[in-house]
Amino acid sequence: MSRPWTLADERIDRSRVAVIEGDLYTALDAQRMEEMGVRTIQLNTEGACHLEADMIEEALALLDLSGIDTVIIDNIGNLVCTAEFALGEHIRIGMASVTEGNDKPLKYPLLFQTADVVLINKIDLQPYTNFSVERFEADIHSLNANAKVYTCSAFKQIGLEPIIELFANK
């Protein structure tokens, strides 16, 4: 999974961030986080499409939280599976990409109904698709008027400023 935020930004002190990384089988994302100096715990579900609160509780017990201000839970799964489970998060961030199409908020409403923030990633690919940011945002806001929506490209480092601010100010 590409990251919707960059820990390379100097306003985010990596030593004060920890990540609980969910994946079916691999530790590839966790390894990338650790290479950036971020305390990381890997959770492999070996088939389940989401993390559950008891898994988060166990992971938190394994993390040295001294000096940690922010714990990011990177859940696994698709837009449907992960939305059904509360993990104790303070901010729920949903992410979709322009390559997935405009219909996701209406086809899979639960994530968008419960998200505090929605990231539309891969915005740099929009010229090669028929994706409409305006339609996508309107559909999100028809489900959840309070959701903040940001467009970005994690790969190209476009539009990350408000996302960095979100983490830097928490």
Regions from the PLM with identified roles:
Residues G88-S97, A138-I140:
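A short, gly/pro- and small-residue-rich
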Residues M1-H90, E100-D103, Y108, F112:
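Nucleotide-state-sensitive switch-loop elements of NTP-binding domains
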Residues V71, R92-G94, D116-L119:
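Short, well-ordered beta-strand core segments
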Residues E100-E134:
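A glycine- and Lys/Arg-enriched "phosphate-lid" helix/loop adjacent to the NTP-binding pocket
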Residues V117, L125-K170:
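Canonical P-loop GTPase G-domain recognition
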Residues G22, S97, A154:
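Cofactor-binding loop segments of dinucleotide-utilizing enzymes, especially the Rossmann-like FAD-
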Residues L43-N44, A96, N121:
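Short beta->alpha connector loops at strand-helix junctions that form conserved
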